[in-house]
Amino acid sequence: MADHARLISLPSSVQDFFNQISSIFKSIENFYLLYKTRLKIFLICTIALIVIVLVAKIIKYTLAFHACIKIYCKPLIKTTNCLLKLGKRKRRKKKRKGKSIRLKELSS
């Protein structure tokens, strides 16, 4: 039986190695238990910071896109507005001329 136990037992260097690994895992576990809330707060803050940066970039690019649209489309909008205004002015002038002729006819 003793010989059988000797065959199963590992050499001391291997046992020391496994003991060191288990102590490392225990220290990591203790560190996690001690700083669990701090780690959660840190993770929440980093995630919030990433979200804020992404939202800021999205807003920046959308504002830049709207600025480009305004810069390039403003002349087109101005010309269409001018044409619309000219068309309205012509119509108004025609209506006024007709009214003024009628008023002159009525007055005379």
UniProtKB/Swiss-Prot annotation:
What are the Basic residues biased-composition ranges?
88-101
Region feature Disordered, mapped onto this chain = 88-108
Gene Ontology CC: one annotated term: membrane
Residue spans crossing the bilayer: 39-59
Where does this protein reside within or beyond the cell? Membrane
| Record's bilayer topology term | Single-pass membrane protein
Alphabetically ordered keywords of this record: Membrane, Transmembrane, Transmembrane helix
For whether the record's keyword set contains Transmembrane helix, the answer is yes
Report which superkingdom the organism of origin falls in.
Viruses
Name used for this protein in its record = Protein alpha-1
Source organism: Adelaide River virus (ARV)
